[in-house]
Each structure stands twice: as structure tokens, then as C-alpha cells.
């Protein structure tokens, strides 16, 4: 779990889910510290609406920007995911990296939503076995 202290996963989530279910996890405030160990890097933007003051948001907004330089420490088979749209948290230069899977992620998400809507409407084709 990588985040500034101000945005860390709430204690009740860590206690009631991670600890209770014995899910191992590690917390850090530095992306660079975790990068060599990651199978998947799931990023989101630093969300302005989570801050009480504009000053706090501006102070932390650019803390976690993924660049080509930071990727040098990452595994060659790591996947980078992001729900999009992005603000500035992933450099556009990262888009050409083979580990950048966020465009495929968004495309597959669209197909899944289409399939779910068809199922809800009862419009799924019969599947022959």
C-alpha cells in the first residue's frame, strides 16, 4: 500500500479486512521503495475531494508521478493499471512501455459493462455446449 500518511488506508479497513483475513501487506510512503517488488502497480490520481484544504492537496498532488525513470527499478513483467482518466500521475512517456496496461484495462472494462447490461436485459445469446 503506497500513499502519503494523510491518505493511508483507514485503520478499520486494515483491521477488519487485512488483519482479520490474515492478508499480508506492507505500507510505505515512497513509490520507489516498493517498485522492485510489485507484480501490479494500480494507480489513481490524488483526489482533491479527499482534502480539507486546497493547500494540503497542492502539497501532495505531485508526490506520486510515475515516470520512465521510476520504472527502471520495476520488474519487466509488472503491470501498470489505472482507471483513467489521469491528471498528471502517469507521465505520457510511460504509455509506450509494454507494462502500461491501462488502455487495455479500460477497453476490457467497457466490454464487461456491455455484457452485464445485456445480461440484465435478458439479451444474452444461447450458448451451445
List the predicted regions and their residue ranges.
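Short, glycine-/Ser/Thr-/acidic-enriched flexible segments
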Residues: 6, 32, 48, 85-86, ...
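Glycine-rich phosphate/diphosphate-binding loop of Rossmann-like nucleotide-binding domains
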Residues: 1-43
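Glycine/threonine-rich flexible loop motifs
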Residues: 45-64
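Structural motif corresponding to alpha-helix initiation and N-cap regions
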Residues: 28-31, 64-68
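Short amphipathic alpha-helical segments
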Residues: 13-14, 53-55, 91-94
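Short, conserved loop/helix-junction motifs that constitute active-site signature segments
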Residues: 69-77
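Short, well-ordered coil/turn residues at beta-beta hairpins
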Residues: 43-44, 83
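Adenosine-phosphate binding glycine-rich loop
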Residues: 77-78, 83-129
Amino acid at each position: 500500500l503506497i500513499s502519503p500518511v494523510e491518505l493511508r488506508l483507514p485503520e478499520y479497513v486494515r483491521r477488519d479486512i487485512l488483519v482479520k483475513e490474515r492478508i499480508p501487506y506492507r505500507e510505505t510512503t515512497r513509490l520507489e521503495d516498493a517498485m522492485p517488488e510489485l507484480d501490479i502497480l494500480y494507480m489513481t490520481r490524488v483526489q482533491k475531494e479527499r482534502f480539507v484544504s486546497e493547500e494540503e492537496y497542492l502539497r501532495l498532488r505531485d508526490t506520486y508521478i510515475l515516470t520512465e525513470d521510476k520504472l527502471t527499478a520495476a520488474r519487466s513483467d509488472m503491470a501498470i493499471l489505472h482507471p483513467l482518466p489521469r491528471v498528471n500521475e502517469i507521465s505520457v512517456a510511460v504509455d509506450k512501455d509494454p507494462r502500461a496496461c491501462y488502455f487495455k484495462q479500460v477497453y476490457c472494462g467497457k466490454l464487461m459493462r456491455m455484457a452485464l447490461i445485456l445480461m440484465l436485459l435478458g439479451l444474452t445469446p444461447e450458448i451451445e455446449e
